[in-house]
Regions:
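N-terminal topogenic module of multi-pass integral membrane proteins
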Residues: 1-131, 142, 238-290
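Generic multipass alpha-helical transmembrane bundles of integral membrane proteins
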Residues: 119, 125-249
Length: 290
């Protein structure tokens, strides 16, 4: 009798140690424009801080952090609405405005969020591999030790949700168990948590603008980078819904500091919503003209 093979073995080992990484298509005009905006934002932020009287080190640090925030806003917008590139460009511009008005926070939560979204929507066209899992668990552990205990909690929930979505990977359950174990190592801050009314207003705007994208996800035609297969609309909607729950929850339970960290992600959602709104207005104008 032939030896029974593991049907998950091929997809688990094929393609190296990372499956959630995605390349950038520099042939796309909007992608090139977004990269230019990222680079210019660093220069503009550095000069603005210098003219404000900051030291050269503080100015350079602010410039690099601003560029990182703009970059993640663009990347996260691509995960929330992979079919339309314009949303990412708008998100980058909104992120610059946020950086100048609100300041910049820690980019580690943004890196974690980016990989959580890719874990769920599978825009890369591949399942998570050992490298992705190590990165996500390390980020969850580090953020948990910083007092942000919700990150390992949401990491575990995301892995379990991934296993239940179409073409879910059964080993996600194991990773979810590891993530929940990290909750025991997380620090819980004893300081009172406050969140400003401005951040609550901002969350309301994000929620309203992202709702059309969740509806449009049913009609996605985006194909995974590696397998060139249309991604599951349910997976895309799961990522979008998780984005709302995660970003709102960490801001609510961890306060204004975490809301600042989430502001580039919210810029990504606003860019997606504004892109869809612009497309709807253009379509309505075209129909009226006909």
């Amino acid at each position: 009798m032939a030896k029974k093979t593991n049907k998950f073995l091929r997809v688990n080992t094929e393609g190296g140690y990372f499956g959630l990484g995605r390349g950038i298509d520099f042939q796309n005009v909007l992608n090139r424009l977004a990269i230019i905006i990222v680079l210019l934002s660093s220069v503009a932020a550095t000069m603005w801080k210098s003219f404000a009287g900051a030291t050269s080190e503080a100015s350079a640090y602010f410039g690099l952090n601003t560029a990182a925030a703009v970059l993640f806003a663009w990347l996260i917008a691509q995960e929330l609405d992979p079919d339309r590139k314009l949303g990412g460009v708008i998100a980058a511009i909104v992120a610059i405005v946020f950086a100048f008005l609100l300041g910049v926070g820690n980019v580690m939560p943004l890196l974690w969020l980016l990989f959580i979204l890719r874990l769920l929507n599978r825009t890369s066209g591949a399942i998570h591999k050992i490298g992705d899992n190590i990165l996500l668990l390390l980020l969850a552990f580090w953020l948990g030790k910083e007092g942000q205990w919700l990150y390992p909690v949401f990491t575990g929930i995301a892995y379990i949700l991934e296993s239940r979505l179409p073409r879910g990977y059964f080993r996600s359950l194991y990773m979810g168990g590891f993530a929940f174990a990290l909750v025991a190592l997380a620090e819980v801050s004893r300081e009172p948590v406050t969140i400003s009314i401005n951040n609550i207003y901002l969350m309301a705007v994000v929620f309203v603008l992202l709702l059309p994208a969740i509806s449009m996800a049913l009609y996605t035609q985006f194909k995974g980078d590696y397998d060139n297969v249309r991604i599951s609309p349910r997976r895309l909607q799961a990522a979008q819904g998780s984005f709302i729950v995660i970003t709102f929850a960490v801001a609510w339970f961890h306060g204004d500091a975490e809301a600042l960290n989430m502001s580039p992600a919210w810029a990504g959602a606003i860019g997606v919503g504004m892109s869809l709104l612009a497309a709807a207005l253009q379509n309505a104008f075209y129909k009226k003209k006909i």
